[in-house]
């Protein structure tokens, strides 16, 4: 796998686009990097709940009018794919789910995830009915998509 965007750089870019909106960060390195990029009282670090980052963000989005950002990982999302179907059913207009896909379960020993062998999470999300999906692999594209 060729690394085109480092998660830390992407996280810093996302933070630069936000005011004080809540961010829910996946466990492990994603939470660590969010902390180091900019620790804020409204960051929610999800240690100890692998697979639930986007589910927590969904619940927050349904109970608030604020924009809620989920910084999830491919391994975490693969552990709870039902979240995508539920996000489609609930259809929150204030939820943004970003999935960092490094093709591995980094928190449990760097085992390869299904995305390393062809599972396309954008297509899975679309199959669940989520129409507004984007695949980005550079910071410029991430910035453009985030501004939409």
What do the PLM-derived regions correspond to, one by one?
Residues 1-6:
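Long, non-catalytic terminal segments
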Residues 7-12, 17, 33-148:
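Thiamine diphosphate
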Residues 21-35:
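N-terminal glycine-rich anion-binding loops that anchor highly charged ligand groups
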């Amino acid at each position: 796998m060729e690394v085109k965007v480092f998660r830390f750089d992407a996280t810093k870019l996302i933070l630069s686009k936000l005011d004080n909106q809540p961010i829910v960060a996946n466990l492990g390195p994603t939470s660590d990097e969010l902390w180091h990029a900019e620790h804020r009282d409204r960051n929610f670090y999800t240690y100890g709940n692998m697979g639930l980052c986007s589910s927590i963000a969904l619940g927050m989005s349904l109970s608030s009018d604020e924009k809620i950002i989920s910084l999830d990982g491919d391994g975490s999302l693969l552990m709870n794919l039902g979240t995508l179907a539920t996000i489609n059913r609930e259809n929150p207009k204030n939820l943004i789910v970003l999935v960092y896909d490094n093709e591995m379960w980094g928190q449990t020993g760097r085992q390869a995830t299904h995305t390393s062998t062809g599972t396309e999470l954008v297509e899975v999300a679309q199959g669940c009915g989520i129409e507004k999906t984007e695949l980005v692999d550079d910071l410029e594209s991430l910035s453009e998509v985030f501004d939409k």
